[in-house]
Amino acid sequence: MDLETFRKLATDRRVIPVTRKLLADGDTPVALYRKLAAERPGTFLLESAENGRSWSRYSFVGVRSAATLTARDGQAHWLGVPPVGVPTDGDPLAALRATIEALHTPHQEGLPPFTGGMVGYLGYDIVRRLEKIGPGERDDLRLPELTMLLTSDLAVMDHWEGSVLLIANAINHNDLDTGVDEAHADAVARLDAMEEDLTRAVAQPPAVLPPSELPEYAALWGGPDFRVAVEDIKERIRAGEAFQVVPSQRFETPCTASALDVYRVLRATNPSPYMYLFRFDGFDVVGSSPEALVKVEDGQAMVHPIAGTRPRGATPQEDQALADELMADPKERAEHLMLVDLGRNDLGRVCEPGSVEVVDFMSVERYSHVMHIVSTVTGKVAGGRTAFDVLTACFPAGTLSGAPKPRAMQIIDELEPSRRGLYGGCVGYLDFAGDSDTAIAIRTALLRGGTAYVQAGAGIVADSDPVAEDQECRNKAAAVLRAVHTANRLGM
């Protein structure tokens, strides 16, 4: 972008992406992350494998963040210098909303769908600011309710073209009319620095991938205690308090590997529609989630309920037999229908009347290790509503709470031994143009202090088997626990 164009855009925009396209068909997203982000805090890598198989068009490398919005002692807290005009204390959700509104910038034609915004996670427990579910006083992990990076520099790999688009966002932090030429020069200098970093040779020798094994792990709330809780929930369901409740267990195992190595193994062994690596201040998040929470693009909102699971078959014939069995299971179908209704109700709160519809109902979607029943629900975002409103209306996912949501979450709060932290919240972005894309934070590891924390839940209904539900939690956590253990042994 030349200086004259930049000056014109600067008259009514606080964020302007300055870009440079390079041919980079010899690099991978992981190599780009190594070269550009160098595994620094405040960086990320976002990828996607459609249906767990073919790679999506774009991968996003977060190279640098201008500031980080987090929470401390229940109050919004910024690391770095926040933009002028946004809250620096108070409700962290309100601070997030205000930041997105203050930096709102129309999407620039010809650029990828994401060029900058607030990127990170909202933990499950931030729902306490949206619903009265209980105090959640037990909090052994003490993870911030949210951590969102104000992304200034990123690189977008276009797998179709074999190109990389470097983006340096010129952010008007002070909301002043002065300093326009200097801001352009600074953005160009950052592009130069990223281009130079791409020329660096980064040692990444092949590493022997050891056989996948389930490591030894500890359960915070498992076995007999969890099964007793399942029986308790079943009694509450029979009494009419809820239709379904989704309790969860947290597992932990040693992690000596880097967050990047855990991510490398997870993307190789369990590719999913949402794959992410975040390096935050003091902890890391690595995940491979199969399920969107909600996506907003060009004023259209979409949720993608997933419920009902079978393993993949060893042969095409066995695979189809398992799919037929899944679709014929009345319990799985009933649970899925309930979640579709939840999705319709959630979108109905923030979409135009009559616009919410189920566009794909109960199809089987296959991933690398499992298959699920999936549906797609869409709606047109109502006037005066934003992607932030849509996100909070759908938060948290019914698949991680139950139905009806408020009472199911109250029961979870009464029974689970500690706050959930990241698990059951969401990971993704709210961009400056008014769009968003978030995944449910499942199949995800929190890495901190040499330990990996992995959490998984099971949907309990009136006829659930406590032993089977306990095992389901362990089965769901297994892929991530295995990835951590494999990463610990890379090259051995």
Annotate each PLM feature.
Residues 1-492:
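Extended alpha-helical targeting/anchoring segments
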